Each structure stands twice: as structure tokens, then as C-alpha cells.
């Protein structure tokens, strides 16, 4: 869940080479979510409560002895359960110096800011999707997003990523490798979703054996190149079929033409000369030409 969240809320064009911040955010989120998982009732195990816990965190750079309400919460848990995994992850976060810890809190808060919106909080308050059932019986799940606003597209990316992970667990642990009901993901306007590269390419290579299938629909090849840079050919190569419905983008035309290869052109020429010693000949030739 946390890896899914981090990957889908990290911009695809992000060039940060320092993993410290993401790992620090991950440690904090693990502490918060594990606390809710083990200590909170099911109705409080949601992103809204995670945001409340982040709001309860505070760091005073000039006072190392200051304890925020969140610090006290984990301190009490550690007194009851010294080996709590949630407390162990929280201690990792607390190793950061005051200024660094505050930066981590700000970074997590910005990453999860959308979950402060009432509509998003309500949407993620309870699990109404029951993703594990998609491979058990015939179900149609529609994820509709506006084409004029991309600010919340990552939510659909999270659903797809969580769906694939859930179905993998169902197939491997319950059905010994293959779902009883095949699941087909029709990813229309895939450029607006842009699933995390490493996770999705790995899944795309192995999902068919588990009766999970994806149709990746884009406007042109330029969209794939923009999303996956040097790995776009890997994504295309992992697809069994390639369907081209036409378009006006030059590079896509060129790519499809090269896929099709050359076609054989048969040419017949007729030559005739008139006069006292006139002649007539027919010449047949075959040549190769790129398919337009």
C-alpha cells in the first residue's frame, strides 16, 4: 500500500537521485499505518485518520525535549508493547534532526494533501471496491476521470496498482497460480494514468499466466515515449498484440511501417518498337517497398 502510494504520487519526470526523503517518508507512513492497523478499529483505518495523525505531529527545532501529541501516542504504545513494529518504524523517523524531521513532515503532508479534501476523504473512508472479488466472479468496475483535470489521476493509478497486487495474491495464495475468472483491464487514455514504470512492466511480463490481461490504449507512440523514456519499447514488446487505428503523428506512422516491414511489388512493363524491324517485349519484375 505505502509503496503504491509513494510511486503513484511521485511525478514521472522527477529527477531526484537522493532516496533519503522517500525512504524517510516511507518509514513515517509505515509507522502511522501500522499503528492504525494494529490499534485502531476498522472504521478508522483510512487516509483521513493518517492525515489527522500527521496533523498531530510537530517538531520544535530549538527544543529537543518537546513531545508532540503523536510522540506521546507512540510512547504509550511502546510502554504497552515494546516490540511493536509501528514503534520501531516511528523511532527510525525520530532519528532525524529537528529541521530534517520537520522537512519530512512537510513532504508527507504535501504528498497526501488531496486526502484533506472532503470528497477524497469520503471516497477513501471505507473499502467499497472489494478488489479481491474481481477474479472470483463477473464484475465490471469503471474508473472515470475528467479529461480536463489531471490533479487526481494518481488515484486511478493507485487503484490499478492495488488491483494488480491484490489479484496476484489471490491467484498465488488461493487458486494456486491462476484466477478462476479472467480479469481484463481496459486502460483507455493510459497517458492520463501512467502507472509506475518498474512495477507495471514487471507485472505486464507475468500477469497473463494468472489470467490477468491489460489493453493499453494511447493516442500515439509519443505519449509512451514521454512517459517511459528509454523503456517504452519494453512496454510495447510485452504486449502480445498491436492494434493501430490510424492517426496523424509522423513518428507513429514510421514505427508502424517498420513493424509491418516491406511488401512485395510486382511490376510488368511492356516495350514496343515500331518500324520495319519492330519488336515487342514484356518484362516482369519484383521489388520490395516499405508498407505505407
Go through the PLM ranges and name each one.
Residues 1-212, 227, 237:
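P-loop NTPase motor domains
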Residues 12, 17-26, 31-34, 132, ...:
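P-loop NTPase motor core of the ASCE superfamily
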Residues 146, 218, 247:
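Conserved residues at beta->alpha junctions
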Residues 191, 220-222:
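Active-site-proximal loop/turn and secondary-structure-junction residues that shape catalytic pockets
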Residues 213-219:
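Structural recognition of the conserved hydrophobic beta-strand(s) that form the central parallel beta-sheet
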Amino acid at each position: 500500500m505505502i509503496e503504491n502510494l509513494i510511486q503513484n504520487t511521485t511525478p514521472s519526470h522527477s529527477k531526484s537521485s537522493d532516496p533519503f526523503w522517500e525512504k524517510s517518508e516511507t518509514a513515517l507512513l509505515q509507522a502511522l499505518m501500522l499503528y492504525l492497523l494494529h490499534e485502531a478499529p476498522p472504521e478508522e483505518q483510512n487516509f483521513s485518520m493518517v492525515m489527522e495523525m500527521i496533523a498531530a505531529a510537530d517538531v520544535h527545532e530549538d527544543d529537543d525535549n518537546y513531545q508532540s501529541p503523536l510522540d506521546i501516542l507512540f510512547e504509550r504504545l511502546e510502554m504497552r508493547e515494546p516490540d511493536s513494529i509501528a514503534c520501531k518504524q516511528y523511532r527510525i523517523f525520530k532519528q532525524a534532526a529537528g529541521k530534517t524531521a520537520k522537512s519530512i513532515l512537510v513532504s508527507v503532508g504535501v504528498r497526501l494533501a488531496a486526502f484533506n479534501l472532503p470528497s477524497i476523504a469520503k471516497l477513501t473512508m471505507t473499502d467499497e471496491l472489494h478488489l479481491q472479488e474481481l477474479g472470483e466472479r463477473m464484475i465490471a468496475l469503471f474508473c472515470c476521470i475528467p479529461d480536463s483535470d489531471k490533479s487526481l489521476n494518481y488515484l486511478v493509478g493507485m487503484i490499478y496498482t492495488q488491483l494488480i497486487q491484490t489479484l496476484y495474491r489471490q491467484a498465488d495464495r488461493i487458486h494456486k497460480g491462476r484466477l478462476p475468472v479472467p480479469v481484463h483491464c481496459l486502460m483507455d487514455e493510459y497517458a492520463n494514468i501512467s502507472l509506475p514504470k518498474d512495477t507495471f512492466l514487471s507485472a505486464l511480463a507475468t500477469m497473463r499466466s494468472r489470467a490477468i490481461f491489460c489493453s493499453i490504449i494511447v493516442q500515439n507512440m509519443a505519449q509512451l515515449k514521454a512517459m517511459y523514456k528509454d523503456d517504452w519499447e519494453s512496454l510495447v514488446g510485452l504486449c502480445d498484440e498491436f492494434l493501430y487505428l490510424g492517426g496523424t503523428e509522423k513518428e507513429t506512422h514510421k514505427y508502424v511501417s517498420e513493424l509491418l516491414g516491406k511488401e512485395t511489388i510486382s511490376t510488368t512493363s511492356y516495350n514496343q518498337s515500331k518500324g520495319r524491324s519492330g519488336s515487342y517485349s514484356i518484362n516482369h519484375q519484383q521489388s520490395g517497398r516499405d508498407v505505407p
